[in-house]
Amino acid sequence: MPAKPVNPDLQKERSTATFNPREFSVLWAGGEERFKEKKALEKLFLEDPALQDDLPISYLSHKELYEHSLRKACIIGEKIRKLRADGEDGVDTYNALLGGSLGSAILKEGNPLALHYVMFVPTIMGQGTMDQQVEWLSKAWDCEIIGTYAQTELGHGTFLRGLETRADYDASTQEFVINTPSLSAYKWWPGGLGHTANHAVVVAQLYTKGEFRGLAPFIVQLRDSDTHRPMPGIDIGDIGTKLGMKGVNNGYLGLKNVRVPLNNMLMKNQQVLPDGTYVAPKNSVLTYGTMMFVRCALIRDTAQSLAKASTIATRYSAVRRQSPIDPNQPEPQIMDHTTQQLKLFPQIAKAIVFKTTGDGIWNMYNVISGEIEQGNLDRLPEMHALSCCLKAICSADAAAGVETCRLSCGGHGYMDCSNFPTIYGMTTAVCTYEGENTVMLLQTARYLVKVYGQALNGEKLVPTVSYISDAINQTKFVNFDGSLRSIVKAFQFVAANKTRIAYEQIELRRKQGYGTEVAANLCGTFLTAAADLHGRAFLAQTAYTELLALSREVSPELAEVLKVVLELYLVDACLNRIGDFLRFIDLTDQDVTKLEVRLENCLKRFRPNAVSLVDSFDLHDRVLDSALGAYDGNVYEHIFESTKKNPLNKEPVNGAFHKYLKPFMKAHL
């Protein structure tokens, strides 16, 4: 329970809710058991004095912040060890501590050990042979070695074929000789690389018998196991301060004639024999499995970012009173302004839809991964395309949504104590890492153009793109009646036509004599538009299917709330793409006006439950870390308390006055 009395406006909002917030909290957590596990983890980690901050981390130097973050990361790691020993750890525990809300509460600027668990270990599991897993995994799980994943370079990121780091096989010693041949070949950005990890999975061009074989992952020791000094041939360090994720210890890595044994190349999918003979993978896409795994996880992370930002902004908007609506009445809660509602409520709805979609994509990834393990690669392209476009769309929308929430809080949202700067810095980073968003959309678009050609040839398409075949057989969209189902179908029809245009434009360029790659570049805007609408059509379909299904499983009161969430999401999404709808569907001015009035009505129906909905995200005050968004709603008191922690305010007269200002003021005398 909060130590201070709850702000009366906030308490009034909670008392008039039409549903039980705990019911939704359990749903959001994934069920009663996971909800209880979440509470237990919060008690274990958030009540530990060693994991609390006396001084806001925004006042720390870059060096101090790293040391502070590493200290906490090691405490977390020790607790994870104990949970593993007690058999109480699981995927949800790692998700919560490394990418979820609990981890962000403890390590607000990121965890320097995160990539060890999120990338290094999964890469060994996904790309190492059974023998290699036996050799490396126990050491990694027990943190006898600390690893990271070194793929991105100073000169190349998402374009993997452009990576310059090179590994040449020396058959005489059965070793690989790894080099970064230029400055642009230096590995750049891996989390924990700067001063934390002593091993890395290094992705490099593979050469055997003088021939280029493609990219391959190698386990490379970076630092001495005892002294932690860089190994011979290793040039390594931290890349410096950034917009966000300031505690992650992103690093750089140069390699000069670094030799690693043959068995240090992860060989589950491709092999090099002792004599240098190369055995190619069954499918080159298999080597990208780790990135697909992370992209799927990131979709759920974007939902958490929106949940945090919308919780802070909604609670603040219930407490803040300003700008009379009726001149004869007192200043209202700013959440009563329709324009404020339009800023906030769609972000809450997106958080719920992104979480629902993220859970579905995660389940889909696990199913398809099982199929891949059995040698069935049929659905791999579909999974790759979906994970790419959804990662791009959800991260972009989440970053924009966080910024919208910040702006909705006026000047106070600009303060560090609001926590918006940190949330935004962490969220916008997702737009770049694990595949820059534009490139991700282009990856999806290539798949869409391919399946469009298959549909023209009468081939049966997988369910997530079957709407393309439907649109080919239906040249005109009929019966847009404004129902939620018709909005979903309209999204699919618009998406199919966007893909049609991209396909036709590429074919036109080919007929003009351009090669496939040049044609694709010339048609880049058509391609990204097609991928964007494909992802949004998938989100609309998933929201419609899953939220209606959930509404049949919960209480009637919560069911009504979920239906309002769904309607708000779909109507808002439709109006945000109304130009595309008007292009491909015969909508009248009256149809659009009806949608706009309907959006206004959705906001009104959403309003009574807004605070209780964000309460249902069940975000601990330590997770929010915001003077504006605390559960008790005492915004101004929390803001003022934050100023008292400012080191500048610890002395009545700062020394700089006597050193600089006073001589300056007296200089004219």
From Swiss-Prot:
InterPro entries: ACO, ACOX_C_alpha1, Acyl-CoA_ox_N, Acyl-CoA_Oxase/DH_mid-dom, Acyl-CoA_Oxase/DH_mid-dom_sf, Acyl-CoA_oxidase, Acyl-CoA_oxidase_C, AcylCo_DH-like_C
Effect of residue 250 to S: No effect on VLCA levels. Increases dimerization. Induces a high level of ROS and severe axonal loss. Lethal
EC code: 1.3.3.6
A Gene Ontology molecular function term of the record: FAD binding
Residue window of motif Microbody targeting signal: 667-669
Family according to the record: Belongs to the acyl-CoA oxidase family.
Protein's UniProt name: Acyl-coenzyme A oxidase 1
Organism of provenance: Drosophila melanogaster
Organism placement in taxonomy: Eukaryota, Metazoa, Ecdysozoa, Arthropoda, Hexapoda
Chain's gene name: Acox1
